[in-house]
From Swiss-Prot:
Belongs to the metallothionein superfamily. Type 3 family. Keywords: Cadmium, Copper, Metal-binding, Metal-thiolate cluster. Coiled coil: none annotated. SUPFAM superfamilies: Metallothionein. Residues 1-29 are annotated as: Beta. A divalent metal cation 4 binds at C31, C34, C50, C54. It comes from Callinectes sapidus (Blue crab). Binds six divalent metal ions. Known to bind copper and cadmium. This is Metallothionein-2B. A divalent metal cation 3 binds at C12, C17, C26, C28. A divalent metal cation 6 binds at C40, C46, C50, C57. One of its GO terms (molecular function) is metal ion binding.
Length: 58
């Protein structure tokens, strides 16, 4: 049986898997924009550089 959170993908929370979700295919989309607090020029860079991308974004 798959984890309850794993339907098509895990439920996401602040750029990471929702607490308690265990899913190999969990890929939470990064935020559209990083704020100035995150020194990133693109959302891809933000998702790699920032520990919690969505918390870094407005």
């Amino acid at each position: 049986m798959p984890d309850p959170c794993c339907n098509d993908k895990c439920e996401c929370k602040e750029g990471e898997c929702k607490t308690g979700c265990k899913c190999k295919s969990c890929r939470c989309p990064p935020c559209d924009k990083c704020s100035s607090e995150c020194k990133c020029t693109s959302k891809e860079e933000c998702s790699k550089t920032c520990s919690k991308p969505c918390s870094c974004c407005p």
